[in-house]
Amino acid sequence: MELAQARNSISDMQEQIDGFRSTLDLDALDASIAENEDKMSQPGFWDDQQSAQKIIDETNTLKNRRDSFLSLQKSVEDLTAMAELLSEEDDADMHAELDTDIEKTEKDLEKYNLNQLLTEKYDSNNAILEIHPGEGGTESTDWASNLYRMYTRWAQAHDFKVEVTDYQTGDVAGIDSATLRIIGHNAYGFLRSEKGVHRFVRISPFDSAGRRHTSFVSIDVMPELDDDEIEIEIKPQDVKMDVYRSGGAGGQNVNKVSTAVRLTHIPTGIVVASQVERTQYGNRDIAMKMLKAKLYEQEEQKREEEHAKLSGTKLDVAWGSQIRSYVFQPYRMVKDLRSGYETGDTDGVMDGNLDPFINAYLKWKLSQKNPE
């Protein structure tokens, strides 16, 4: 790009940095980090491992918030200095380096800005993501497998760990259901944008007549909750446990021992399953976390409905409502029905490029809370 254009881009980035700086108390961040590090250096810190891990995680979050801002601030300062040098004496190699660094810093700023939109209580938690095909037979189960691939690709691109806790293959193709644990900081905050019904339109490869088909898949997303984060009483007599032989995605890594666990919460009928661990105990522990997450979600839904009734507002019920359409025929377009964001890059979306949709959703969600 021309030097004048580069300077305009740098100026825009500096404005964003100044805006972030006005809302960021670096001294308070440093004080909180120092306080936590002092606790970590005390004898007996690991006596309560759960509490210790919580302090470590909190410290890492604070450091990440501080260090990512300082890194961005330094990058923009370096870009400004490089542009000044080029204004005095043009250098082709330095100019190319400036263009590359501007592009990288713009992406880093977009990522930082996205993180600032995560304001909900459990946004920093791991996510539990469930995939359930709707009616439509093979076409729907195949669409479910496409979404499974899309979310795993997205998670891998963000360095999140993916654990497949449950995976049931379709009769002909695709999957009947799947449950993923997306492990990493802010996983739930990003993925809560995906909860709802995803509609898919294409010429079906399973239809010999080559007709256009519409299929639906429901995605449910919940935060993974630790025992100290929420109190949900689950009576032992209310839970039925079944064990079975585990098998990985597509029938891989089949276990000859019944280590997989399925829990049924009798009062609500909620069913969860885990087959990712090598022992029944490990899978039961994960399944219990998933059950708590589902019970929490159920209670939150009730509270939101009651609040909406009292305030006279219309509740946005994501589960059971269509949130996004993916059209591959007669044209190619993916459109979010809440934020209005759309793109013709269907291949990129199916390869996991969901960040523009997530960003648009978070901004839309914030605007719903603060309409002015």
Curated annotation (Swiss-Prot):
Q: What GO CC annotations are associated with the protein?
A: cytoplasm
- State the family it belongs to: Belongs to the prokaryotic/mitochondrial release factor family.
Enumerate the InterPro entries for this protein: PCRF (IPR005139), Pep_chain_release_fac_I (IPR000352), Pep_chain_release_fac_I_sf (IPR045853), PrfB (IPR004374)
Q: What name appears for this protein in its UniProt entry?
A: Peptide chain release factor 2
**PROSITE patterns from the xrefs?**
RF_PROK_I
Function per UniProt? Peptide chain release factor 2 directs the termination of translation in response to the peptide chain termination codons UGA and UAA.
Per the record's keyword annotation, is Cytoplasm included, yes or no? yes
Does the UniProt entry include the keyword Glycosyltransferase?
A: no
Q: Which Gene3D superfamilies match?
A: 3.30.160.20, 3.30.70.1660, Release factor (1.20.58.410)
Q: Where in the cell is it found?
A: Cytoplasm
> A Gene Ontology molecular-function term?
translation release factor activity, codon specific
